[in-house]
Amino acid sequence: MQPQYQMGYDRAITVFSPDGRLYQVEYAREAVKRGTTAVGIKCSEGVVLIVDKRVTSRLLEPVSIEKIFKIDAHIGVASSGLVGDARSLVDRARVESQINRVSYNEPINVEILAKKLCDHMQTYTQFGGARPYGTALLIAGVSDGEARLFETDPSGTLLEYKATGIGTGRPAVIKTFEDEYQEDADFSGAIRLGIKALHAATEGKLDVSAIEIGVVSIETGEFRKMEKDEVKAYVDQFEE
């Protein structure tokens, strides 16, 4: 049972505790930590996103679980946490992207889009009558010929990474990347490293049907999700 003095701060989003904490934001972060593992890796050719969709029942169709989304031709995101919250943010990101195209006749800059999403997420930590988003996003894209990878969290914090992970397996992913990440790796090397990180995060319980991969290329400036046979080929290479 919670101490009496703490319960009021738990219930109010906009009230700081005496030690400077917003408990509801911290609880939203816990929702992300319980989510499926997603990784993002920048490489010499672009950015790779890989997600373990965690199929919890053999009766479940893996294709019905979507954790990587295309936002615009040059941007994709991976999510961890509450799927419904992620879809809401994805829809908002798509609208912001189209508004930019209509207003300025050019694709939106990846960093600008990431900041707009984080500004929106931050407002849900500052006003009553709503709760923080219980999801985190990895935003990958190409702007001005440069690969970019950003991570958001429920507080509205925005950070840029060379390689990172979100979700339940984040500690194992970060350790793998810190030990083995190389900036000059190509798509193939980055994907193999990402699968290795997921393998560590899932304690060796990789299921090829639950792996989703998206890549955004510097050369073409386009984001795409890989087909099942492409994903299977990379997983098979890793397991050999």
Swiss-Prot record:
Predominant location category: cytoplasm
GO terms, molecular function: threonine-type endopeptidase activity
A GO CC term assigned to this protein in UniProt: cytoplasm
Cell compartment(s), UniProt: Cytoplasm
Keyword Ubl conjugation: no
Function field: Component of the proteasome core, a large protease complex with broad specificity involved in protein degradation.
Protein family: Belongs to the peptidase T1A family.
Entry protein name: Proteasome subunit alpha
Gene (UniProt): psmA
